[in-house]
Structure formats: C-alpha cells, structure tokens
C-alpha cells in the first residue's frame, strides 16, 4: 500500500566502493525505479572524505527527522561505509538499508541481504526493518566484529594498496602477504 506522501530515501555512497550515479549499466535508474514504486523519493549523496561525511549525515538526518515519514537511509558501500552511516543514525528510529558494494560485505552476509545490487534494493524497498546488536568501544561502534592483531593491519594495508594502485579485489590477498612478510608487530594486551 503506497502512501500519497513520498518517503525520503537518502542513498549515501562511497565513491571508492565502485558505485557510480552515472554508470553504463544504468543501475542508479533501476534503483530509483525500485524505490519509487514503493513511495520513496531518492536523493543520492557521494562521500569523498570523513569531514564531508559528517556534514552530509547531519544534513540527511535533519531532513529525515523533519519529514512526517522518517524514510530510510541507505549505505551503499562496504562494511566501513555502513559502519560510519550507522554511527550517525544509531540513536534515531530511522532504518538503515544496505547496498553491499564492498570487498567482503560481512554485515550484509550476516544479515542475509542479497549481494546483488537490485535484489538488495528490493529488500530495502519492501522489507521490514530488523533490530540488530551494536557494540561500542570508546567512541567507535562495531556491527559485526572488533579485531586486534593482524586483521586490522591487513585492512589498513589493503586500503593503502587501493589508494595507490586503484581498487582491486586482488589487493585483499597481496596486502595480507605484505603484512605477514614486512609489517609484523608484537602486540601486548593487558586485561583487568
């Protein structure tokens, strides 16, 4: 049942995650068709850096909270993009949709969200919001895990490779080898 008033849908996408508004495959147009068929009015926001992210998310939240229909805020990117969007939306009642465009998409897989972009959009447009647990350590939130040791080094090195050589799935493997061969560090933990 479609309401007469359109519901806001803010599509927050990481320009590094492979999603483009102007794509040859027309995926953005297909997404907006799926969303508008369910009464959503889509507005896209490209994120380039963390300062811009904070500014855009403040604007997006104000728009959604001012609307009689809170709508949906969609994170289009990987787990990092999703985590940053969730951090801003955490203390609101606004649902977050996931368009999984990252390398691993752990959260989307954990929640059973289709990895196909258009199928994930259909879930966002027609599905029911589900609550999920969120962990908080200091000022950071974690949707699927928090890691110590080698894994965070792998991720940092992979992002370095992506920044230097462009975004390729192969970097997940080559950066891990680089960490194992050159970047080993001793980690001491103290528990109380």
Please provide the spans of the model-predicted regions.
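Short Gly/Thr/Asp-enriched flexible loops that form oxyanion-binding sites at enzyme active sites
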Residues: 80-94
């Amino acid at each position: 049942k479609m309401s007469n008033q359109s519901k806001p849908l803010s599509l927050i996408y990481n320009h590094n995650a492979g999603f483009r508004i102007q794509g040859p495959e027309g995926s953005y147009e297909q997404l907006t068709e799926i969303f508008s068929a369910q009464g959503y009015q889509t507005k896209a926001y490209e994120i380039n850096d963390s300062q811009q992210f904070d500014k855009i998310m403040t604007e997006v939240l104000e728009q959604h909270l001012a609307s009689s229909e809170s709508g949906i805020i969609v994170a289009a990117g990987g787990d990092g993009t999703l985590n940053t969007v969730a951090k801003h939306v955490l203390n609101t009642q606004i649902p977050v949709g996931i368009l999984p465009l990252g390398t691993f998409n752990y959260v989307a897989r954990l929640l059973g969200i289709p990895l196909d972009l258009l199928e994930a959009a259909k879930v966002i447009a027609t599905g029911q919001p589900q609550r999920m647990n969120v962990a908080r350590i200091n000022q950071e939130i974690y949707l699927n895990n928090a890691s110590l040791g080698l894994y965070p080094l792998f991720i940092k090195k992979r992002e370095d490779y992506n920044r230097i050589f462009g975004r390729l799935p192969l970097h997940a493997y080559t950066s891990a080898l680089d960490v194992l061969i050159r970047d080993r560090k001793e980690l001491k933990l103290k528990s109380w």
